[in-house]
Amino acid sequence: LKDGFKDSEPSIGYGLTETNAAGTLNLGKDYLKHPGSCGRAIPPVTDVAIIDENWNFLDESKVIGEIVIKSPANMVGYWKNEEATKEVFNDDGWFKSGDLGYIDDGFVYIVDRVKDMVIRGGENISCIEVETAIYDHPSVQEAAVFGIPEERLGESLCVAICLKPSMNLTQAELESFLQDKLASFKIPSIIQIGHEELPRVASGKFSKTQLRDV
């Protein structure tokens, strides 16, 4: 983008409806140096931190946890839903974003959604990471990775794939393709391959709830 538009200043930001879009900002030279980051917190409006599942703040750099935001722009709460409000706020006004990420030298990096992290045999697996590797295959048009309960390992990693028209791909071929791209425990154990478009919700995202029920 910068090469094509010499006078442009590429930028990206991060925020949620619940934070009135306030969160982080990455623009100009910072963006060119850290293109994978959604930026730094916007002072003095926002503070951003990382917590574990027990609301303990993680001070170590590059440690993955849930992104939390504190800001005067944060919502007061969900309309007539006190229980849902309590689930996402602590007593100090920090809001749980539902996004997994880490902070490196002040720059925030988003890894995945909390609900899209699959725990398989004690290992955390990012669905986005696996989907990205699968999309590298030239036959794949759509791919949705998700977990389903499994007694021995906790969750099984599954993927539903829609192939491009006239293209073919077997489970064995996909597994072989992924061996050089992913650790073995990140390769899905359940693979559904077809030519039908994957179901989506109103926002356009894949309906992983519906896929789990198939």
Language-model features, listed with the residues they occupy:
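AMP-binding/adenylate-forming catalytic core of the ANL superfamily
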Residues: 71, 76-77, 87, 98-186, ...
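Gly/Ser/Thr-rich phosphate-binding loop
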Residues: 1-33, 47
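Conserved beta-loop-beta connector loops within the AMP-binding
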Residues: 4, 49-68, 87, 105, ...
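Core-facing hydrophobic residues within beta-strands of well-ordered domains
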Residues: 7, 43-45, 140, 188
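Short, P/G- and charge-enriched loop/turn segments at secondary-structure junctions
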Residues: 31-38, 179
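Beta-strand->loop->alpha-helix junctions that form or flank phosphate-binding loops
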Residues: 10-20, 38-42, 146, 192
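Conserved ATP/PPi-binding loop(s) of AMP-dependent carboxylate-activating enzymes
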Residues: 24, 40-45, 56-88, 125
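Flexible lysine-rich "adenylation lid" loop at the C-terminal edge of ANL adenylation domains
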Residues: 195-214
